[in-house]
């Protein structure tokens, strides 16, 4: 069945443009409340990032949920994975996150977690969509839901993060720079690492509702690179606006992406005989990662891009580790979804165990040159299906002679076509990527 509102990662868009409007959020809250209270009264958690629009949408969702007879537990600004965790621990029927992840402040969105802290099954999302398009009715006054605020949510999540490493863990002597993207991790992430003994320098932790992800965070690491070098830090950690992506910077200022972090965690788990199965990556994962894991006899498979597909593949195979080069990393022995703080903890712990620097670990394997170009498009036409684009892809693939990969895909969250070319010659790879991007741009014009 075709989805009307839900995309690959919930509902997302520009604030004030349908469906990211207060009236829609009211109806969405009501529809979700009706869907989850099939068995009677229910409790639903709401968390959000630091966007100014989050407060407006929180109120609208709360009103809709209450009208459907659902009690609401308000967490305030809290990382997306924290909402998943707290939904489980409070035995709530569902959790709702108000966030547009790494997008600018003028975007916002909604994603749901089931009572188990996992992404909602497709059938539940479709049920909510059907209810949105039905007339809204309010339960009897005695059945209206109540709202309350969970004041110790941050402390609960901090302790949960720390529980993902041994109680003997001591990061004393380690100097870190943490970039919170002016987002949902700004209170909890520095506390986690400080309480484990690290010296922490914090940037990107002054949210004003408008500066989330603005030249900071996992998609804009320039300030972190500069701060790491200036402060003589051992490494830097950058989170995105909602705390489900992480990138790192070594002491020289070099960026360490999700593929490289996955390799560090995977090999550490293997050495400690705690790696169940192999590693799930995506179509965008660097070919070098696959080859490096193969050299360590660690199985590797690719899922479609998007953490929900990575998690689905992990569950299908019974594996405990997966992620994306963008920094979504899922450590299933600890969490039910991608958790940037917990992934960062596993990396730092692995470095301490091995007595290695992040720079040394970064050089442990060779990344194949990979060029990614985003091309914006509009309208309903699929540029990837255009004959000119297909012909250009076939031409590039043939010229690579089996020594690389070509991938074109539409973003699940933005009107973008992502053009990716990977191979063993950086100049050739860039030229071919630009050639393909030019064709896609012409088709989209």
Curated annotation (Swiss-Prot):
Its EC number is 5.4.2.10. The modification Phosphoserine is found at residue 101. Catalyzes the conversion of glucosamine-6-phosphate to glucosamine-1-phosphate. Belongs to the phosphohexose mutase family. GO terms for molecular function: magnesium ion binding; phosphoglucosamine mutase activity; phosphomannomutase activity. NCBIfam families: glmM, PRK10887.1. InterPro entries: A-D-PHexomutase_a/b/a-I, A-D-PHexomutase_a/b/a-I/II/III, A-D-PHexomutase_a/b/a-II, A-D-PHexomutase_a/b/a-III, A-D-PHexomutase_C, A-D-PHexomutase_C_sf, A-D-PHexomutase_CS, Alpha-D-phosphohexomutase_SF. The active site is at residue 101. PANTHER family: PHOSPHOGLUCOMUTASE (ALPHA-D-GLUCOSE-1,6-BISPHOSPHATE-DEPENDENT), PHOSPHOHEXOSE MUTASE. PROSITE patterns: PGM_PMM. Activated by phosphorylation. One of its GO terms (cellular component) is cytosol. Mg(2+) binds at residues 101, 240, 242, 244. This is Phosphoglucosamine mutase. The keyword Aminoacyl-tRNA synthetase does not apply. GO terms for biological process: carbohydrate metabolic process; peptidoglycan biosynthetic process; UDP-N-acetylglucosamine biosynthetic process. It catalyses: alpha-D-glucosamine 1-phosphate = D-glucosamine 6-phosphate. Keywords: Isomerase, Magnesium, Metal-binding, Phosphoprotein. Disulfide bonds: none annotated. It comes from Stutzerimonas stutzeri (strain A1501). Its cofactor is Mg(2+). Binds 1 Mg(2+) ion per subunit.
